[in-house]
């Protein structure tokens, strides 16, 4: 499973989560205010798409200008990125799988084998938005696109940027610390996270950032998974 990111990106994400989601202006009075997403739409070749109507001028990815993460945009048409595809959590690399690899090819999908590792390889081979190092987001990263202003049943995403989305459960790369057979997912019907078995079949939304993802064991500024 490919894993990349950057300390600067994580610092941006920390500010993104701790300040705007809760209050309007850190240090000001605690006034509830909906979070405003700032994203740029991208075409398959990575160029900027200046359209806002997905039906007339569809885009393939979005760049979050606050976290510096790029996200894939799911599609309703059949194929590799179809919104209904599901995948089991699978990572055979003992250095990154949290102690248990999960289960290979246990989802229902088209375009690749139906597990997280296979999907990542297929998207990177496609060079989605001109990129070939997409990876499964961490629990922390996936939280940055949860739209807390959207009520159940969701989907709790900024629809202006993710127009074709389902309110399902989406995998993260984060193994549950005390149960290696489990991994964290974000549920986009309720906008909450929970732990499920790696053998289950759920959705995927890959992300990308230019630099290396920090290792909690080696980088002192990054805390290890909290649960």
Model regions and ranges:
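Bacterial N-terminal signal peptides
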Residues: 13-22
């Amino acid at each position: 499973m490919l894993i990349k990111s950057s300390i600067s990106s994580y610092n941006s994400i920390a500010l993104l989560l701790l300040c705007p989601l809760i209050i309007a202006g850190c240090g000001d009075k605690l006034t509830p205010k909906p979070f405003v997403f700032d994203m740029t739409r991208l075409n398959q070749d990575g160029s900027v798409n200046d359209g806002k109507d997905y039906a007339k001028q569809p885009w393939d990815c979005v760049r979050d200008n606050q976290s510096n993460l790029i996200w894939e945009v799911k599609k309703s048409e059949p194929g590799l990125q179809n919104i209904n595809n599901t995948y089991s959590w699978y990572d055979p690399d003992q250095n990154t799988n949290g102690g248990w690899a999960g289960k290979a090819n246990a989802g229902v999908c088209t375009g690749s084998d139906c597990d997280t590792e296979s999907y990542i390889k297929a998207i990177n081979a496609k060079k989605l938005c001109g990129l070939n190092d997409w990876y499964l987001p961490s629990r922390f990263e996936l939280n940055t696109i949860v739209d807390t202003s959207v009520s159940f049943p969701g989907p709790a995403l900024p629809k202006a940027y993710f127009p074709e989305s389902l309110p399902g459960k989406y995998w993260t790369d984060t193994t549950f610390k005390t149960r290696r057979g489990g991994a964290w997912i974000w549920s986009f019907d309720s906008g909450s996270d929970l732990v499920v078995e790696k053998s289950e079949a759920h959705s995927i939304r890959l992300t990308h950032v230019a630099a290396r993802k920090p290792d909690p064991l080696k980088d002192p500024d990054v805390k290890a998974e909290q649960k």
